Each structure stands twice: as structure tokens, then as C-alpha cells.
Amino acid sequence: MSIDSSTSANIETLPVYSDSSNEYIQVIYQNPNIYEHEENNFKSVFTKSEIKSGQLILLEHVLVNDSTNSYLIIENNEYLFDMSHPRTDKFSECSEENRRLQAIKKLSSNCFGIDGNKLLTCAIQKINHSCTPNCAVNISEKYNFGGTHIVFMELFSINNIPANTEITISYGPVTGHKRDFECLCGKSLEEREKIFSIVCGLSRKISQLNNDLIKKYIYVYTTSDLGKKIMLNHFLATKGIYINKDKIVAITESGAETINNLVYKYMKIKESDQTNKKITSHKIKMFMTIIHACLFPEDSTDSSESVVLMREKN
């Protein structure tokens, strides 16, 4: 499903929750009747007041990637590293080796699985497991924007939830009993599978009922500067280019090839003449300037002039 301007009607009053410091994952909508609670370094989410069944609780643009790319993103991004459980040493306090080991642990503790890939969230990963949950997650993979495939997670209430009640979801009939906590539900695997199947069916049905509202939120987000930047960062990660605080901080061989190809293509240098493959700060700056000009065409005049100056210096 493509996102186009036809979904933009009556959206100017829709609140869009955003955190510009998070460069890979974004909460697009958060129900105002929930709050986050932290105790002994563990987080949970509670209701402030009653939430009726069938309500949208959270809508989140999530990060989907293979295991290697996912842990490299966490390892090289300060916000995601410090946010993810277990929160022991801070990003700035870790050696490179220790940060790599912790990133692997954080990935296993905070991700969902989808089609063999890892799915990283910011808000939904704070919600604890219950084999009889009061909320359900729907993973929406039907959107693309500018040729970029993007995945959203939707969280809905499936019961009337009283005030001051913990929000819970099911991690799955098996996974929910394998994580680093003890489930005391006492239910058999067969019972858990039956409940999980019902919950999944409810989440799909409620998502369909809320489809128009969700499309409007997604349109506002994907056409915003923040949404475009995060989609770009997702794309760069698939190429082996990793961002922290708006700067390229790590590059794989594939990433270096992507940077060289774009810069040399813009400079109209023939492949036979591309002798200098070294990634320099100057080349990275040129790469990011070209990308910015494509992503934000309204600023393209200034960006184009900057690239021209770089070409002349080169």
C-alpha cells in the first residue's frame, strides 16, 4: 500500500508523538492514558485511567533488519544502546569490545522476530508478557514510501482496562516462557497456544477497524522531516552504514562501496578512473550532502552549491 496525499484529509489536528534523539525507531502515536513505570531497572507500562476495548494504545515505526545489522546499529548508536535492557554501562563508558558484547545481549533481550529478521522497538519492548494479556500487537508490513519498505507495530486494547492496571501483551505461547523471567500462569502449552491464536485474531480485526486513523498518522509521520530521516537511516543500515547523532560512525565493506559508488557517480568519474577507494571525512561529507539534497529538495539549492564546492576541491 503506497502512502499518498489522499490520506491527508483532516489530519492537521492529529497529535504525532516524536523524539528526534532516536534516529532509528519512532513512536508515532501514544495513548495519553498510559505511563511508564520503572523499578529496579525494569520498565513496565500502566494505565492512568480506564481504557476501553479496541483502543489504539501505541503506533510505532520499528526497525527490521537481520541479526548482524541489528546489533551493529545498537553497538554504534548511543540512544539505542543506553535505552535497551539490560541497562548496565552507558555507551560513553564502554570500551569498543565491551560495547559489542553488550549490544548482542541487548538485541536478544529487546527484539521480536519476524521472517528470520530482528524487529527492534522503543516503546512496545517495555511492555511485559502475560499469557492472558489485555493488549495485542499487530505488525503492519503493507506500507512503502518512496520505494522504501517500512514496518509499523500497532498496539490495541483487547479488554476494558481499569485505571492503574499494567498493560501486557503475549510474547507467544513458547517465547513467553523462555525469556529471563518466570511465568506463573500455570497454563499448558495447548491452552497458551489457543489464547495466543485468539489474541492474534483480535489484533488483526481491531487493526482493520482502525485502518483509516492509522493511515492518517502514518501519512503525517512519513511526510515529516523526522520520518524521512529515520527511513533514510534504515536504508543506510541495510547498506552497512551506521549513524549516531547525525554522523556516520561505522561502515562495513558494503557501506564503503555504497559511498564510493554514489560520490563517483555524482562526480561523473568513470569506473576505470576510480582509483582512490579510501573513505575519507571529505568523501563522507560529500555523500551525506548528496543524500540530504535528495531527501529534502526544498533545501536543494544550498546543498547543491555545497556539493559543487566539494567537487572543485576534490
From Swiss-Prot:
Query: GO biological process: any one?
Result: methylation
Which EC numbers characterise this protein's activity in its record?
2.1.1.-
Q: Where is the SET domain?
A: 23-172
* Protein family: Belongs to the class V-like SAM-binding methyltransferase superfamily.
S-S bonds:
none
Protein name, UniProt field: Putative SET domain-containing protein L222
Species of provenance:
Acanthamoeba polyphaga mimivirus
Phylogenetic placement of the source organism = Viruses, Varidnaviria, Bamfordvirae, Nucleocytoviricota, Megaviricetes
Q: What class of enzyme is it?
A: transferase
GO MF annotation, one: methyltransferase activity
